[in-house]
């Protein structure tokens, strides 16, 4: 036991059992978003979005995605667990609508999850229910359970406006951004 009452030495890595990947302090030019999926239901998956950067882990928002499916159904299935690059997408309908909605000073491109096997155009955007996901990741400031009724997240635009600028600027500055999806909800059971 060290002087802080812990059973590990300061130079050892910290491991949080059952919560996915070890907490890793990232390099100054790298950030990793982490989606901890905690509740699967018939039509939706609820999660928590964290940012891992040079200063550790920070909670950003609640998330909502489509449900888990063994066989993909277009725009009705959450993406597989794993780590993916995120880039800015500056074409397409969502990009045009967000330019109109938020203006060019704010909106620099959609946060686009890259190279997901069997999926295209996976974006991080606003919305409240699984009907708004189209297979993408929705972010919000509030969350309601999806056990006895359909999943719902609220204040989505507020959350997006809070987290988007720093992530978009990070990417615009040429830094690396990844996102890791962790299935803590164990949907296969």
Roles of regions detected by a PLM:
Residues 5-177, 182-188:
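Cell wall/extracellular polymer interaction/catalysis modules
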